[in-house]
């Protein structure tokens, strides 16, 4: 398994979110690691769809609770399957993180299908890093709010 990691560049900033990236292109994978890591996220990147799926599956087990991912960003075709199949594989797990798919195909059907299976977005390559950051930040902001409401509800 080829795993690439980055941790927040400022060690005094506590880790808030973990991102799992699936990207076969080494240059794009390194770029995403650098940019999202510099934004303060812990990023784990995989070079193959098999490794991505295995890493995600392991992270969903209760004994690895601290290792769960908050968001998955993956090339839809790198997984060797339709993105819907990937999402379906994990639909029985309540803790599956949201997915953002990337693709070189400008296919409206692909986008509609991915969104119908729960993907937050389908971004076309070449990626606009500002668009990706907006989606990541928005998704993680909502996740943080939801967790805060759960904690407040449990204590109140």
Regions found by a protein language model. Give the residues of each.
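Active-site residues of response regulator receiver
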Residues: 70-76
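Short amphipathic alpha-helix used as the core "switch/output" element in two-component signaling
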Residues: 82-96
